[in-house]
Design a protein with these regions (language model features):
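A short, proline-enriched helix->beta-strand linker immediately N-terminal to the Walker B motif
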Residues: 9-13
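Catalytic Walker B motif of ABC-type/P-loop ATPase nucleotide-binding domains
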Residues: 15-18
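ABC ATPase "signature
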Residues: 74-75
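Conserved H-loop
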Residues: 44-50
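ABC ATPase nucleotide-binding domains
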Residues: 87-135
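Helix N-cap at the start of a conserved alpha-helix in ABC-type nucleotide-binding domains
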Residues: 26-28
């Protein structure tokens, strides 16, 4: 947190954070991510966030998955996280909401894998169950 404060004081155009939330408790992780989002929104600072936690990338404009030094996936969070099997092949997991929808799809419920928030996920499940009842 102190290192991030020092970088902010220099007023950069771009900040690169490599595993910035590693070793932080959930509250500390949220605080760092909120600060990063605020810097991007309010000051227009470009933020490159390097993380193994896919949930930290949910709010990004763009997600790039690297594998052995090459770009394996590149797109919006919805585009990348909906490719659950490919993420698994790289040893990564999609956000919990997408993983839940993926499991429901595997069980036969026709759901899209594009819900990143809990509310979106709940709406997707309710719509799918409502459609299934209507049959």
């Amino acid at each position: 947190r102190i290192a991030i404060a020092g970088v902010i004081a220099m007023e950069p155009e771009c900040i690169v954070l490599d595993e910035a939330t590693a070793m932080l408790d959930p509250a500390g992780r949220r605080e760092v991510l909120d600060t990063v989002h605020r810097l991007n929104r309010e000051r227009g600072i470009t933020v490159v966030l390097i993380t193994h936690h896919m949930s930290e990338a949910e709010d990004a404009d763009r997600v790039i998955v690297m594998n052995d030094g090459t770009v394996a996936m590149d797109g919006t969070p919805c585009q990348v996280f909906s490719r659950v099997e490919e993420l698994h092949a790289f040893g990564l997991a999609a956000p919990d909401t997408v993983e839940l929808l993926y499991e429901l799809r595997q069980a036969g419920l026709p759901v899209a894998l594009d819900s990143l928030t809990v509310d979106q996920c709940a709406d997707t499940i309710c719509r799918a169950l409502g459609a299934a009842e209507g049959k």
